[in-house]
Amino acid sequence: MSVRLDDIRAAKALIEGRVSLTPFNRARTLSDITGAEVFLKFENLQFTASFKERGALNKLSSLSEDERKRGVIAMSAGNHAQGVAYHAAKLGIPATIVMPLGTPFVKINQTKEHGARVIVDGEGLSGASALAHELAKK
């Protein structure tokens, strides 16, 4: 899948005002090491403390009304799960998140607190992913 500049502009317009504007600063050490100007964006200042909510909100916002009513299923062991759960709840979209066995309790709990139904199952990411695909087919 290729991403074009127009895709980025469309995503920006779709999520603008619905996620935090976060600052960025020049990373002196990384700039010195690479010989290029490197900047770091502080996405940890988002509500879920991760840039992942940008992509989650972009995708959820693009769903049709019928798709929204059916809900979404995602697989993640952490930050993406929280981004999907948080924005799905804000948009009134039912969300089920499959998290692999061994996912830290804090990630599971935060995802539930954001309003998602959480299923903890599957050995590793591949096992949880297979389960999520199976659930999506139903």
Region roles according to the model:
Residues M1-K138:
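PLP-dependent amino-acid enzyme catalytic core
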